[in-house]
Structures are given as structure tokens and as C-alpha cells.
């Protein structure tokens, strides 16, 4: 608040729906049938965690941590076989991240991109500029496609060429189910939110087309908020999906893909830098205000946009009244924060 910024806290969980996996139905991961990304918006109950949230989160962390340890072992073996004397441990990578972000080592949980970044940085630290291309070629099993001054591109190559399915450092993921993921979001005080890929996949995932059927499936899950990452979408497709969803009583939010070191704009853009349609911008702003209001009210012990079971706030006669009221409350929260004097 002292910097006049309203942080909206959230999390993302990967779940697996075996019945859709068996049927070959892609949900919102274009390469993996049955794999579901689900988000939680307006998280409030994370410090301290409730015992229920702690149990649900620990199961996910335990599975992830074991997978990362096994991948690090395979990465080290690949490096050794290539004659590259880099062997990073789980603790090594965690300490790097903790130093970078100024956080306790105990707060760090590794993901694939952390491992790829650590190996790229360590190879560059150990090899002179003239020798880096050869070292990377040995490590990757072929010349890098990215320029040597493109650190993020090289990290992405390490990940895609060594760590993905069918690659030498790959370790299969283990996932929780949908109900586990939804329960964790609610136990942390959040709003379950469906990330919509739409034309971010080609062809569009079976679960997500046509938009009217997707809306019905989201509502069947008792989810009342969706998210778009518009940098993946053509403006007309984004507008078609977002407007239909909002008319159906779903809150619309936006993400900006800031999950790597790529220097992307903070303001949402569509594919190839095209502007987000004005009507969708308004929906994104409305959604941000709803999340801000939910977060502020839950923090003060009041009812949020959804309750602890994920049911919509019953103080309002319908979705339109609920969304409008929370958007208005959230706009006040944001305005009161950004207009206060800087310390």
C-alpha cells in the first residue's frame, strides 16, 4: 500500500482428469489430454495456512520436489556425459533463487524453468564467452538455436530439448485431481478460476469449443471466474469468448505470461502485440476490481465473492448484481490505495 500498488494474490495448480485423459480430450493444455490448469484468485489465507490447506499443499509440494530431485540427477548425468563439470543439487538451485528474490531458502519450491535457468547460468559462469557455444552444443546434443546473448531463449531450449516428455532428463509428472485442486484454492480463501486457452491452441482444445459448451462445463464445475492470457489470442477470438462468458455471468480476468525472465509489457496485449479490444479491456478491469474486493473483504473477515465452499455470495439476487457490486467495491479499494500520498 505504501507504494500505491494493490497486489492481487493467486496461485496455479495442475490437476489431472483421468476420464478426459482416457477419452483424449484436451482441456487447456494443448499437448496433454486430461491435464487441467486451474487458478485461484484473491488468495487471503496463506499466512498462516490452515491445517487443511497445509495438508493439501504439502501433497503437491512433495510430489513436485521428488520429481525435481530426479530431474536434477538426470541433468547432472547429462552434463557429465558431455564433459561439462556442472552438477547442481536441489539446495544449490534453491539458494540461487533465494538470493535473487531475497527470500528464505525454505520458501523456494523448484519448477522446470528454475533448473533450466540454473544450468544456463552455471555454464556461462564456468566457460569463457568463446567456449560457450561448444559447451552448449555438447550439453544439448546439437547447436543451440538461440543467440548466446539470449539467456531466456537458451533456458527455454534447455527445458524443451532436455526436460520435456521424450527427452533425456524427463521425469513423468504426478498430479492431484480436480477436487483436490479446487479444495486447496478455497482453503486458501481464493476464487476458483478457469484459465481459458481458446485459440492459444491450434486447433482449439476439444473441451473449449464451442464457447457455449465451455461455459456450461465451467458452470458444471461450480466455477464463476475465468482468466485469459491474451498474448496468446487473436483479438476477435478473445472478444468472442470473453463477451459470451461475461453474458453468462462469469467474471473475466487477464494474465500477462510473466512466468519467465522475458521482458513483457505489464499491460495485456493480444498475439503479436495487437491491442486488446476495448470492450474486453473493460471486462478485465471489472474482473480485477472483483478480485480486489473479494480479497479486501475476506481479509477483514467479511463474505467474499464466493464462500468457503465456492458458492457465490448469496447476498445478491443474481450473478449480474453480484459482479456489479463487487466491481464497484473493488474499484474503491484500488482508488483509495493509488490515490493516497506516498510515504
Language-model features: where?
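Repeat-unit-sized solenoid/scaffold elements
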Residues: 114, 224-227, 259-270, 326-342
Amino acid at each position: 500500500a505504501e507504494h500505491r500498488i494493490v497486489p492481487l494474490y493467486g496461485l496455479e495448480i495442475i490437476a489431472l482428469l483421468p476420464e478426459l485423459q482416457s477419452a483424449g480430450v484436451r482441456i487447456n493444455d494443448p499437448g496433454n489430454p486430461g491435464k487441467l490448469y486451474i487458478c485461484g484468485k484473491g488468495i487471503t489465507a496463506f499466512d498462516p495456512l490452515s491445517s487443511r490447506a497445509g495438508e493439501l499443499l504439502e501433497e503437491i509440494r512433495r510430489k513436485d520436489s521428488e520429481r525435481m530431485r530426479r530431474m536434477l540427477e538426470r541433468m547432472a548425468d547429462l552434463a557429465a556425459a558431455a564433459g561439462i563439470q556442472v552438477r547442481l543439487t536441489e539446495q544449490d538451485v534453491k539458494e540461487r533463487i533465494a538470493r535473487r528474490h531475497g527470500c528464505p531458502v525454505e520458501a523456494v519450491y523448484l519448477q522446470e524453468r528454475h533448473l533450466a535457468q540454473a544450468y544456463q547460468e552455471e555454464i556461462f559462469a564456468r566457460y569463457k564467452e568463446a567456449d560457450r557455444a561448444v559447451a552448449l552444443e555438447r550439453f544439448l546434443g546439437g547447436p543451440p538455436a538461440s543467440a548466446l546473448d539470449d539467456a531466456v531463449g537458451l533456458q527455454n531450449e534447455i527445458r524443451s530439448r532436455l526436460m520435456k516428455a521424450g527427452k533425456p532428463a524427463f521425469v513423468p509428472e504426478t498430479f492431484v485431481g480436480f477436487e483436490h485442486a479446487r479444495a486447496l484454492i478455497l482453503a486458501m480463501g481464493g476464487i476458483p478460476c478457469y484459465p481459458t486457452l481458446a485459440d492459444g491452441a491450434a486447433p482449439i482444445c476439444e473441451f473449449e469449443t464451442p464457447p457455449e459448451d465451455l461455459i456450461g462445463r465451467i458452470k458444471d464445475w461450480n466455477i464463476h471466474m475465468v482468466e485469459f492470457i491474451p498474448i496468446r489470442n487473436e483479438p476477435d477470438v478473445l472478444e468472442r469468448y470473453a463477451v459470451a462468458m461475461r453474458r453468462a455471468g462469469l467474471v473475466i480476468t487477464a494474465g500477462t505470461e510473466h512466468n519467465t525472465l522475458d521482458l513483457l509489457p505489464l499491460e495485456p496485449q493480444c498475439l503479436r502485440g495487437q491491442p486488446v479490444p476495448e470492450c474486453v479491456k473493460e471486462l478485465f478491469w471489472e474482473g480485477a476490481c472483483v478480485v480486489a474486493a473479494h480479497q479486501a473483504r475476506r481479509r477483514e473477515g467479511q463474505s467474499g465473492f464466493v464462500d468457503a465452499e465456492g458458492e457465490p455470495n448469496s447476498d445478491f439476487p443474481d450473478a449480474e448484481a453480484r459482479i456489479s457490486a463487487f466491481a464497484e467495491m473493488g474499484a474503491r479499494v484500488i482508488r483509495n490505495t493509488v490515490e493516497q500520498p506516498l510515504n
